[in-house]
Swiss-Prot record:
Name of the protein in question: Bifunctional purine biosynthesis protein PurH
Record organism: Streptococcus mutans serotype c (strain ATCC 700610 / UA159)
Record keywords: Hydrolase, Multifunctional enzyme, Purine biosynthesis, Transferase
Record flagged with keyword Hydrolase: yes
Xref: CDD domains: IMPCH
Ranges of residues in domain MGS-like: 1-145
GO biological process entries: 'de novo' IMP biosynthetic process
Family recorded in the similarity comment: Belongs to the PurH family.
Catalysed reactions listed for this entry: (6R)-10-formyltetrahydrofolate + 5-amino-1-(5-phospho-beta-D-ribosyl)imidazole-4-carboxamide = 5-formamido-1-(5-phospho-D-ribosyl)imidazole-4-carboxamide + (6S)-5,6,7,8-tetrahydrofolate; IMP + H2O = 5-formamido-1-(5-phospho-D-ribosyl)imidazole-4-carboxamide
MF terms (GO), sorted A to Z: IMP cyclohydrolase activity; phosphoribosylaminoimidazolecarboxamide formyltransferase activity
Statement: the UniProt record of this protein carries the keyword Hydrolase: yes
Superkingdom of the source species: Bacteria
Lineage summary: Bacteria, Bacillati, Bacillota, Bacilli, Lactobacillales
EC number: 2.1.2.3, 3.5.4.10
PROSITE patterns: MGS
Length: 515
């Protein structure tokens, strides 16, 4: 019996050659709409879909393949006499191969001028139905959704006259992933359209971007996936200009670094980061000086770190960065001379380019944190804060210079792992105390790191001080201004301690835990 293929594709790459090879192998081809036009134009004889269904394509193509003569030919089990007899009774011809890809819903909604009506019209109905029918009956039907699979299928058909069950099963799995992702993207779009904040079902669509050698440790398998609707300002969208491929830990650190620098939009800023904690942040009127400050913040920890800059990298800054070992440099752009300097004798240095003009869109994204058996979802910590809303709770008011330093410190502390403490002046970090299980230990680490640079320094805490001993440690170091959320039942004890030592203390009313 002559084998029958049904071909209906929106992506016509490679389809003419594939169909011609099928014809050469003796297959007959049923086709639809634009696909039939393309194949006919190439001189490939095809059967029109309406000759199979007995109905014309109608309603602007919305109804063309939803018919028993199509789905009966796809779903009929060849090993069941009742199914075979039903096909004979109703004059249904079995379909052995389905080649379908779907309306370009994703491509449509990514267009800047796409309307809601455009999106709706590009929701494919018949295509997923055929794919799912064929995939369900993969014991008998080969189903293809990806042009990359054409060559393998032709090789098997040429060698054996049919595809193997293993191949059909693998292709069926690919189809179910494809249709599930397609529907999930539609669901995501409609959820956003109606403004649903807490959907009872959560579907997320990601595409494999990079298979990884290993994960956080060599014994862990890992891969990197990118959102099906890419976020412009994200590590997943960064363009790599030089160096080895990014590792699992590189990606996490780079993601953390570009989150930090989002809060420093107004002035040239450089962030150095290690193990997802900032180890140096510098801000100045030019990017070279900002680099100097970030580097001087912690000369040791920056070694082998991640550096992100929010202005174009010039030759002078590149020369300084080239002088030390860095894992990754991220910037919106590089001068030709700077790029030449950074890549000289450093073929492994990962250099990434990331446009900084889409930061607000990235801030609107949800954060997803996996736990065993579940997923936590939250908004990002991007609350808009104004110093005008802060409260000075001590007798002593901060000086103008201290006010500037406190604003800088408060931006930086958001990205230090809790319990987080940071010591800064008005243009650079001086000491970072991250991730301790008691806050006073973080205070001691940050102060010890700042050492002899404490004159005029201020201190920020990501959450309230539970006891006044924190303030006592700070006072002993000579720091004269503190910024923290407040909110402890013992706030007054901390205020009294600050007053005792002539320290200005500001309450923001906003906590910035980071786990």
């Amino acid at each position: 019996m002559t084998k029958r293929a049904l071909i209906s594709v929106s992506d016509k790459s490679g389809i003419v050659d594939f169909a011609q090879e099928l014809k050469n192998l003796g297959w007959e081809i049923v086709s639809t709409g634009g696909t039939k036009v393309a194949l006919d134009k190439a001189g490939i004889d095809t059967i029109a879909i309406d000759d199979v269904t007995g109905f014309p394509e109608m309603m602007d193509g919305r109804v063309k393949t939803l018919h028993p003569n199509i789905h009966g030919g796809l779903l009929a089990r060849r090993d069941l006499d009742s199914h075979v007899n039903a096909m004979k009774e109703h004059e249904i011809t079995p379909i052995d191969l389905v080649v379908v890809n779907l309306y370009p819903f994703k491509e449509t909604i990514l267009k800047p001028d796409a309307t809601y009506a455009d999106a709706v019209e590009n929701i494919d109905i018949g295509g997923p139905s055929m794919l799912r029918s064929a995939a369900k009956n993969h014991a008998s039907v080969t189903v293809v959704v990806d042009p990359a699979d054409y060559a393998e299928i032709l090789d098997e058909l040429s060698a054996n006259g049919e595809t193997s069950f293993e191949t059909r099963k693998r292709l069926a799995a690919k189809v179910f992933r494809h249709t599930a992702a397609y529907d999930a993207l539609i669901a995501e779009y409609f959820t956003a359209q109606v403004g649903e904040e807490k959907p009872e079902k959560l579907t997320l669509t990601y595409d494999l971007k990079q298979p990884m050698r290993y994960g956080e440790n060599p014994q862990q398998n890992a891969d990197f996936y990118q959102k099906a609707l890419p976020t412009a300002y994200s590590i997943a969208s960064a363009q790599q200009l030089n160096g080895k491929e990014l590792s699992f830990n590189n990606i996490r650190d780079a993601d953390a670094a570009i989150r930090v620098i989002r809060d420093f939009k107004d002035r040239p800023t450089v962030v150095a980061l290690k193990h997802m904690n900032p180890c140096g942040i510098g801000q100045a009127d030019d990017i070279e000086t900002a680099w100097d400050y970030a580097y001087e913040a912690d000369l040791v920890s920056i070694f082998g770190g991640i550096v992100v800059l929010n202005r174009e990298v010039d030759a002078a800054t590149a020369e300084k960065m080239h002088a030390i070992f860095l894992e990754i440099i991220i910037a919106p752009s590089y001068t030709d001379e700077a790029l030449a300097i950074l890549t000289t004798k450093k073929k492994n240095l990962r250099i990434l380019q990331l446009p900084f003009d889409a930061q607000e869109a990235s801030e609107a994204e949800k954060e997803y944190t996996g736990v065993v058996g579940g997923l936590l979802v939250q908004n990002q910590d991007v609350v808009k804060e104004s110093p005008a809303d802060w409260q000075v709770v001590t007798k002593r008011q901060p000086t103008k210079t201290e006010e500037t330093a406190l604003e800088f410190a408060w931006k930086a502390i958001k990205y230090v792992k809790s319990n987080g403490i940071i010591v800064t002046n008005d243009h650079m970090t001086l000491g970072v105390g991250p991730g301790q299980t008691n806050r006073v230990a973080s205070v001691r680490i940050a102060i010890d790191q700042a050492k002899d640079r404490l004159d005029g320094a201020v201190l920020a805490s990501d959450a309230f001080f539970p006891f006044a001993d924190n303030v006592e440690e700070i006072a002993a170091a000579g720091i004269k201004a503190i910024i923290q959320p407040g909110g402890s039942v013992r706030d007054q004890e901390s205020i009294d301690m600050a007053d005792k030592y002539g320290i200005a203390m500001v309450f923001t009313g906003v906590r910035h835990f980071r786990h």
